[in-house]
């Protein structure tokens, strides 16, 4: 018994040693800033002068700030990519789940953007969507357009283009989650539905989608949090301006902009708290909707 206890203790210590670096990073760069930002939001913080307590002044400013509401609107628009991302991810998972030649290579290629820095991805796509870049070159070569389209300097196209880039990078991650689930489904269920005369669409909609429900909810929550917290693609492609003409302002970027361009750290902290509340509301709504839908295994 003593030997077993020592082995368990040793394994526990080893586990804590492996987790310690990640936990230290989380404590220093995530949890401490979150805790510090809460009282900061109620002050007029000054780097060089005195910091004054201002109560709810920063939150009152938010209500009257048109740029903040523009950022909220754009962040909510970004959330619209969540269902598109899930549909494409499920479609790709079904495609690569087939036992066809070359699917292993295809999986790697689809997953590759996930492990690539978003900053690097954004820089590459910035060149691709340039007026003299690959996309415009192909569209003009095929005769679909006569003049280059300014994807990233157009108020109407800049945000949708960034959404497309974000979808492209996230596809591989969600595809692998759905693929893992598909590969663990009992084949007897699929075979039984076929024997009962179900078409391919009926099998997909009546059998596979209910079985994928836990993964769909998980991926929807994760991608919603990611969409509301989007920052790097906006910052990189717009060179830290949120342009053209503020059209790509999102909440996370606007919080950064107030802190490091305007040096208004108290107001930035207030924006961050509101972002956290909006994210919480979205995910609570998803949870409520999921519970109303019931458990597919009931």
Over which residues does each language-model region extend?
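N-terminal leader/signal peptides at the extreme start of proteins
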Residues: 1-5
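A structural signal for multi-pass alpha-helical bundles of membrane permease subunits
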Residues: 7-298
């Amino acid at each position: 018994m003593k030997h077993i206890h020592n082995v368990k203790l040793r394994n526990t210590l080893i586990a804590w040693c492996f987790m310690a670096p990640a936990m230290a990073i989380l404590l220093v760069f995530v949890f401490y800033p979150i805790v510090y930002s809460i009282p900061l939001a109620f002050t007029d913080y000054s780097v060089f002068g005195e910091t004054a307590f201002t109560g709810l002044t920063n939150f009152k400013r938010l209500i009257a700030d048109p740029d903040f509401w523009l950022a909220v609107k754009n962040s909510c628009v970004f959330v619209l990519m969540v269902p598109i991302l899930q549909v494409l991810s499920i479609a790709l998972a079904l495609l690569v789940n087939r036992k066809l030649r070359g699917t292993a290579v295809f999986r790697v290629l689809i997953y590759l953007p996930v492990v690539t820095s978003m900053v690097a991805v954004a820089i590459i796509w910035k060149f691709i969507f340039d007026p003299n870049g690959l996309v415009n070159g192909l569209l003009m070569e095929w005769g679909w357009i006569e003049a280059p389209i300014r994807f990233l300097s157009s108020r109407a196209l800049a945000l949708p283009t960034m959404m497309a880039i974000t979808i492209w990078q996230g596809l591989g991650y969600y595809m692998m989650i759905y693929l893992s689930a598909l590969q663990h489904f009992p084949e007897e269920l699929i075979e039984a539905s076929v024997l009962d005369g179900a078409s391919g669409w009926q099998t997909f909609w009546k059998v596979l989608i209910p079985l994928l429900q836990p993964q769909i909810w998980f991926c929807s929550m994760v991608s919603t949090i990611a969409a509301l917290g989007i920052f790097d693609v906006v910052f990189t492609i717009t060179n830290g301006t949120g342009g053209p003409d503020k059209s790509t302002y999102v909440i996370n970027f606007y919080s950064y902009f107030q802190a490091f361009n305007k040096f208004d750290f108290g107001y930035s902290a207030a924006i961050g708290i509101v972002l956290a509340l909006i994210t919480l509301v979205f995910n609570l709504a998803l949870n409520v909707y999921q519970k109303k839908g019931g458990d597919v295994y009931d």
